[in-house]
């Protein structure tokens, strides 16, 4: 399919039709940068979706963290079910980069844990960009980090068509060059197996589909898509393209040229270190690099191969590395979501990476070429980005400068909801007053969000409210992601009534049940009480018709004054629109998606209980297969908390199956 097909029961409403028309007019007139100022609950994602459908251009949406990227991906996936909506974020569950601390002479080895499902989705994203046009890639800002060259990545593909001849040994060798592994016993993603006249391939971009190639001599007769779990045939294919199992696959002559380049740089660097009388650094660099060269010669790869990426891509020192932006077509469209946060992150990423690597190079742990394995500099990102729409409720200085201060506003909500009423109260007895406000709000069946300045204040206030028998919890950076999801679900379901946090605006909190947002010490100027932070926090109460905000302050700061003035301006515009069109504000009643549980076996169930639930091996194996498919499906839908529960249940059943056998 080459056209986007938006499927939704809703039509653009409020400010959305006007905003969509203005942005599209700007794109058609070749404006490079535009600013979409969308307040909380105004339907920014739906507006973006309509712009994408009408312009019919491949699109990249950048978000400032994985969580927000996942939310946008999920929404876009539901709006465009017939198109390629992809997810591209860092595939590390855990990442400790290599580093050297000179003052203590401590070297920290690189340590990481790769999430296979996210790696799969990254491959799916790059494949879609190279094969079709109806593509939306939702990415975190990590997409500006180096990636394999798109030219080499596409050059290394294996194209398969029935009726053509493929010498068996050459085909198997080509698959190995793509970093696929032969595994006739365990068939998993990135593997192939050979059975008689058939070759089965499990592509890197699939989790639940594989390809069976049926040969007569060297002639490929059929390509069947099948379920790798059950063996069931799903479809007959006219052609198939096998992409590399890594974005860093490359032909052997490229590897050989890279080895020569690395050896040449090594000799120059060793001579320089010797001239500086740095004998330890000389020995260290020679030993580490020679080992890497040996691994590259024998296997075509080595640990930390990305540090030599400049030699593989053929780029000169200082040139930008290939990134996801080089996979985009020339007429692509870019949305930068929450640009007031995303843009400063992009600016900061190069400098922090450079500072760490310069120490490694200086002390002989890496060659100077390792400095070119990096994220894009901000000015490079500026050069590479296509036509861009910045999206934020609180635009930053860069976006306003780029657009000449011209913004396209989304102020009218389709629901008719107004920006919340804001009240200033003295901070002297803020906790005492807060308790009475909590009492009144909770009595209405609504929830309360409270923001403090420090982690200790959040914990102390939570403990105090719990002593008073209020159902309270707190949220800050030390709370694990999955635990945070559970806390937010508990808040929406009423298991807890009050959530205390430090910087709640950064958590992406959208709680329709929220009736009160309390900002403690609102007059303490700083990052947490800046104009942008206050406007974002006030927005947390904008999804309920009874939403209110109390700012506890003993003096009127510039930030409070500007935040309240902007909120009042928006509220007046919304009121006038509602009166003119006879709209009554209506609270968003969004469904609460609870964590699903399986009745057949609990994750805490032991193997004896599993035996009683499934009295024979056949039943047990059937349920293991079913559970495994559900786990993979949950992971591919980014329902990681559900996938983790299914994984635990799967382990229990597998242990029971081993005992029965």
Swiss-Prot record:
Domain Helicase C-terminal: 430-592
SUPFAM superfamilies: C-terminal UvrC-binding domain of UvrB, P-loop containing nucleoside triphosphate hydrolases
Motif Beta-hairpin per UniProt: ranges: 91-114
Keyword Thylakoid: no
Subcellular location: Cytoplasm
UniProt cross-references to Gene3D superfamilies, sorted A to Z: P-loop containing nucleotide triphosphate hydrolases, UVR domain
Domain Helicase ATP-binding per the UniProt entry, residue ranges: 25-182
GO molecular function, one term: DNA binding
Domain of life: Bacteria
Regions annotated as coiled coil: none
Major subcellular location class: cytoplasm
Record flagged with keyword Transcription regulation: no
Residue stretches making up the UVR domain: 621-656
Function: The UvrABC repair system catalyzes the recognition and processing of DNA lesions. A damage recognition complex composed of 2 UvrA and 2 UvrB subunits scans DNA for abnormalities. Upon binding of the UvrA(2)B(2) complex to a putative damaged site, the DNA wraps around one UvrB monomer. DNA wrap is dependent on ATP binding by UvrB and probably causes local melting of the DNA helix, facilitating insertion of UvrB beta-hairpin between the DNA strands. Then UvrB probes one DNA strand for the presence of a lesion.
Annotated HAMAP family: UvrB (MF_00204)
Domain notes: The beta-hairpin motif is involved in DNA binding.
Subunit structure: Forms a heterotetramer with UvrA during the search for lesions. Interacts with UvrC in an incision complex.
This protein's name: UvrABC system protein B
Origin species: Rickettsia akari (strain Hartford)
Lineage, broadest ranks: Bacteria, Pseudomonadati, Pseudomonadota, Alphaproteobacteria, Rickettsiales
